[in-house]
Amino acid sequence: MTRRSWLRLMAAGVLVVWLCLFLHWDNTEKSMIRALLVETNGDSWTVGLLYQFPVASADSSEAEAAIRLCIGRGPELSSAISAAEEALPQRADWRLCEYLLAGQDSVQRTLSACEELFLHRPYGRLASRVFGRSFSVEILKERADETDVLPENLLQCIKNAAPAAPRLYQQSSGFILPVVELEDENAHYRPEALVVTPEQTGQLTESQTEMALLLQGKSWTDTGEHRFALEAGPLRLRRTFCGVEREGERFLLRVNALSRNNALPADAEAELEALCADTVRRCWTLGLDISGLGAHQALRDGHFALTTKNVCPEIRADVKLMKC
């Protein structure tokens, strides 16, 4: 082999080593932001960042690393985020930030501000899964200083509930918002969700929340199961099908489902029918057409649109349960 060939081979080797070192540094020397927590008291903003400093590839959403929390404050949302970034051990990388947690006392203002900011700054995604939370960033920081596992448990909680959570860009039409709570070293979602619309925010009962998820084709569980605490006893449903029909001047909501109970509780179908109609009316009052009655009306009558600004139409529910 000639001297020139040896030089070319050595140059290629040096280049490969340099590229490997560069890629390793680029992938690991970052603080990967996994979730953004935002709250405001009207005069200032407080931000919390759940981040990890991975030892594996930064492109892997399952990178093995402990989850940590840092916070920042500022008169504006952008300045609060910048302050939180300065508290990170390494420069921030937002590629894996898929979750936004808003304080339940300032949900509407927080979500509107985040949507506007994300349109111009790469701090998050308009497709971020959105959650409410009953605790402040300060309380989370205090508890996280006492136990290292809390931030990681919080992230795991919202990851588990993510399929049932709405996305940020859906706020203009309203949505059902799950609320996360802290309990010792763990976190869990509250059985009672919020209805968030541009007009107002209201709370559903536990049964209404479960029915609202059922009508939307969502579930808290990985198996798609729905659980109801009826007066006659607990009921577990799966493989639900929901449909809307026009019945004269009123709407008919059909719900068919498989029951996982060995024996159906007495009057289970009647209880679910009443709950279904009650949930639709409650959401309608808060400004959310959860069953798409307006869209069904528009398809039927063309130009005429039924919106939540109108009085809620008459509703009848028909529930049919079958054993697995």
Task: Write out the residue ranges for each language-model feature.
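Membrane-proximal alpha-helical signals and transmembrane carboxylates
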Residues: M1-C324
